[in-house]
Amino acid sequence: MIILVGGEKGGAGKSCLSQNLAVYLQTKNRDVLLLDADPQGTTTDWAKEREENDGLTNLPCVQASGNIRQILKDLATRYQVVVVDAGGQDSEALRSAMTVATHLLLPFRPKRRDLKTLVHVSQLVKLAKAVNPDMLVRGVITQCPTLPSQVQRILDAKEACQSFGIEPLQSITCNRNVYDDADENGSSVLEAETDLKAKEEVESLVAEFLEV
């Protein structure tokens, strides 16, 4: 299984989702590898922090850039799950990964500047589907406001995804400090004791996305 987390706009939480996905699957006894294809190296730094924390399980992480198609095909024969953090830009790494990924998760914040990228992202998905028709593609609305008065913004964002042929998950993530706190020490919200709502969000998201 190759799970690709990517998109065209930075700041939507792709690295955070990649990390939490990987930890979740590891807790389910899957042999997981993280591949950081983002030039910023956020997930690589996270994995190093995690390795230095004796209270956390080690989660292997490698870096790669450019055309990573063959790299992913090789890694998929050695690990049960490869989770790819492709970062927030249209890159050769993102495009090449889309040709072999079994699952593609596209995070969007419920903001106009994020949703404007749907035009181009949907075109990339269409191109990838021509050579990788079995890839499961889902959008997810992230960093959502928790105020009840803002629910319509979330619904509108999901509708925007649908209008471009990208099926959104019912599950969302909300704007919670614990996501940033966990990222800074190599942890995940699944291992944090401070905010169980964030843990429930990730568990719901992964269960819906991967049906596990």
How does the language model describe each region?
Residues 123, 152-158:
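Charged helix-capping and loop-helix junction motifs
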Residues 17:
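Hydrophobic positions on the alpha1 helix immediately C-terminal to the Walker A/P-loop
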Residues 118-134:
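Conserved C-terminal guanine-recognition region of P-loop GTPase G domains, centered on the G4
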Residues 145, 157-187:
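Beta-strand-loop-alpha "switch" segments that mediate conformational coupling across diverse proteins
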Residues 93-112:
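Inter-motif core of Ras-like GTPase G domains
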Residues 180-199, 203:
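Inter-lobe coupling/hinge region of RecA-like P-loop helicase motors
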Residues 2-8, 12, 23-95, 131, ...:
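P-loop/Walker-type NTP enzyme "switch/lid" segment
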